[in-house]
Swiss-Prot record:
This is Anthocyanidin 3-O-glucosyltransferase 4. Pathway: Pigment biosynthesis; anthocyanin biosynthesis. Pfam families: UDPGT. An anthocyanidin binds at A142. SUPFAM superfamilies: UDP-Glycosyltransferase/glycogen phosphorylase. Its EC number is 2.4.1.115. The keyword S-adenosyl-L-methionine does not apply. Faintly expressed in cotyledons, roots and leaves. GO terms for molecular function: anthocyanidin 3-O-glucosyltransferase activity. It comes from Manihot esculenta (Cassava). PANTHER family: GLYCOSYLTRANSFERASE, UDP-GLYCOSYLTRANSFERASE 73C3-LIKE. The keyword Amino-acid biosynthesis does not apply. It catalyses: an anthocyanidin + UDP-alpha-D-glucose + H(+) = an anthocyanidin 3-O-beta-D-glucoside + UDP.
Amino acid sequence: CNKLKLDKAERGDKASVDNTELLKWLDLWEPGSVIYACLGSISGLTSWQLAELGLGLESTNQPFIWVIREGEKSEGLEKWILEEGYEERKRKREDFWIRGWSPQVLILSHPAIGAFFTHCGWNSTLEGISAGVPIVACPLFAEQFYNEKLVVEVLGIGVSVGVEAAVTWGLEDKCGAVMKKEQVKKAIEIVMDKGKEGEERRRRAREIGEMAKRTIEEGGSSYLDMEMLIQYVSERSPSRA
């Protein structure tokens, strides 16, 4: 499951980027040097909050992939990108943007990825854990704050951006600042740090990633759970009545 590049690329929706081009770009960078930033398919951030994220990513001086979902391509964000010269600076830095759906599993499994900046949705959390990648946690609403605690406080494989309040759906403009560029920069720098604490976090992430992969192999807990589910459904199928 998800061992072949094609399987990884086709997980979820159709990617909005050429996978060959994406992999060629990733191959340019040293192992563990690239930040992958994606805040899910229903992110509720305003254009100025997305601008803070973009500036924070830029200020780390690390290569990064930034996923801008269709709903996030607002007029305000596009105006800011053009007026502030952000896209021109992006071309000079050679960062990679994905506008739309991202082949997330394919990206996270590449050795160049050193950190996953995520909203901590459960699917993304599991994909980050399974890939063995340290997480920068930026929860926005609902159970994402519990998932943040899991990766930061329980598993010890992540760092929190410091979001203190949930984004209320439909009232994003009234929620105030979720994060500032300085918070983004600081959290990423902690995760990417080459010191003892950073190395231990990466070791833990790799170790837990291997544990997660074993659960879906034959005899693993998830493998057995799926077998039991299939058996349960089959035994109750009308055709067997």
